[in-house]
Each structure stands twice: as structure tokens, then as C-alpha cells.
A protein has these predicted regions:
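Bacterial N-terminal signal peptides that target proteins for export
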Residues: 1-12
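Bacterial N-terminal signal peptides
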Residues: 10-20
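Boundary at the C-terminal end of the N-terminal hydrophobic targeting segment
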Residues: 24-27
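Early exported N-terminus immediately downstream of N-terminal targeting peptides
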Residues: 29-104
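Surface-exposed, polar/charged faces of alpha-helical domains
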Residues: 47-54, 58, 87-91, 114-117, ...
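Surface-exposed, charged secondary-structure patches
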Residues: 105-146, 198-215
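Short beta-strand edge/turn micro-motifs at domain boundaries
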Residues: 145-173
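Low-complexity, intrinsically disordered terminal/linker segments enriched in charged
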Residues: 166-215
Length: 215
């Protein structure tokens, strides 16, 4: 997978919250659920005062909060670790969920702040019981259309995103492949160490060369 496509996976999930404003195909409850946090995201991105460097921490905290409301990071973690999830202790599971959520939230914010006027249009929505898929296409400023599907499920009293599929590539499957490779060639403890290092580098805006765990 190319770096551009890897970055696009997280960018697409980030854009889900700031681009779901126009209507293409008729929107149903899952799409409506995604819309709930849109106004606050747009407000944070469009507020000149909040965009000031001195308020960076506040702005990013707001955007991370929105991401946390829209995505089911625990479910994403379970699916990404797959068979390795059940072999972990409750304490290890809790730690990894937090590490994965932190990495995703920070990646989400860093990509979201690169938003450059892309548009989105809906191509459909399907719901089967407590599972749903919202199908969209992101339209770049050059007119290129990128198909993006948001896989969601019903949890408690709302729909939450547990995977993003861009051009047929699943964000969760991408991480699952990386996690499997690291655990297979090294150890679970090494994976945790890399997750911690990656989270720090994303927080500091550092681009790592030749490092695994690329979103």
C-alpha cells in the first residue's frame, strides 16, 4: 500500500465529520447520526480565533472529542488485533484500546487540519439490523472521485463507525495486517512499544521513515 493511500485512509475518516453536509442519496439514520457532530467540527475548523496557534491545544482537544463520539475505537481495536485480542489479559486489552484510540485520534486531528476544500456526495446507504454502511465519494478540488464507505454498527443509543474503506482498502484490515506482521516476527510487547512510539511521533508532528504502523 502506498504512503498516499495509507494517509488517505485516515484522511477519509477525518473528512467524514467535516464533509457530511450536502445530500446526494436519501440519508437514513446512520448518516443522520454522523451529522450530529458536524456543526461543532465545522465551527472549530472555521473559527479564526480557535485557529490561532496559541489555541492549538484547545482546537485539537475539540476535534479529538468529536472523533471519540463518532468512532467505536474498542471495536476497531478488537477487529484489528483479531485472534490476538482473546489472548490478552483484561488489563492488556484496556491498555491497547487506549493506545489505538490515542493513535487514531491524533492521526485524525493531524489529517483533519489539512482539510483543503474537498467535497463529498452520497451514493447510498444500507442497513441490516444493527449493521450499516454509508457509501460516499470524496471529490477532490481537481475533480477526482474517491469512493469511501463507512461501516457502522448500533451501540447503546447511537450509530458508531468501526471501519472506513477507501477505494476498497479497509483501515482496520490495514492495521490488522501490520499488527499480525509485528507479532509474528517479534512479540506483542514489541507491538505495544511501537504503538507508544508512534503516538508520540504523531503528537509531535514527526514523520518516521521506515516505521510500521502507518495509517
Amino acid at each position: 500500500m502506498t504512503p498516499l493511500r495509507r494517509g488517505g485512509l485516515v484522511l477519509a475518516s477525518a473528512l467524514a465529520l467535516v464533509l457530511l453536509t450536502g445530500r446526494g442519496a436519501t440519508a437514513g439514520p446512520p448518516t443522520d447520526q454522523l451529522r450530529e457532530s458536524i456543526d461543532r467540527a465545522l465551527q472549530a475548523l472555521g473559527d479564526p480565533d480557535l485557529r490561532k496557534e496559541v489555541r492549538t491545544r484547545e482546537r485539537r482537544a475539540t476535534l479529538r472529542g468529536i472523533a471519540n463520539e463518532a468512532f467505536d475505537f474498542e471495536e476497531m481495536t478488537k477487529r484489528a488485533l483479531a485472534r490476538h485480542w482473546h489472548g490478552r489479559t483484561p488489563a492488556e486489552q484496556k491498555e491497547f484500546v487506549q493506545l489505538f484510540a490515542d493513535l487514531m485520534e491524533r492521526s485524525y486531528v493531524s489529517k483533519l487540519e489539512l482539510y483543503a476544500g474537498e467535497k463529498i456526495r452520497y451514493t447510498g446507504e444500507s442497513v441490516e439490523g444493527e449493521q450499516a454502511t454509508v457509501r460516499t465519494k470524496i471529490v477532490t478540488k481537481q475533480g477526482t472521485e474517491i469512493p469511501v464507505d463507512y461501516r457502522m454498527h448500533w451501540r447503546g443509543d447511537r450509530w458508531l463507525v468501526y471501519d472506513v474503506v477507501i477505494e476498497g482498502i479497509s483501515l482496520v484490515a490495514n492495521y490488522r495486517s501490520q499488527f499480525n506482521a509485528i507479532i509474528r516476527t517479534s512479540t506483542y510487547q514489541e507491538l505495544v512499544a511501537r504503538m507508544k512510539t508512534k503516538a508520540i511521533s504523531v503528537a509531535e508532528g514527526v514523520t518516521e521513515k521506515g516505521t510500521a504502523l502507518q495509517p
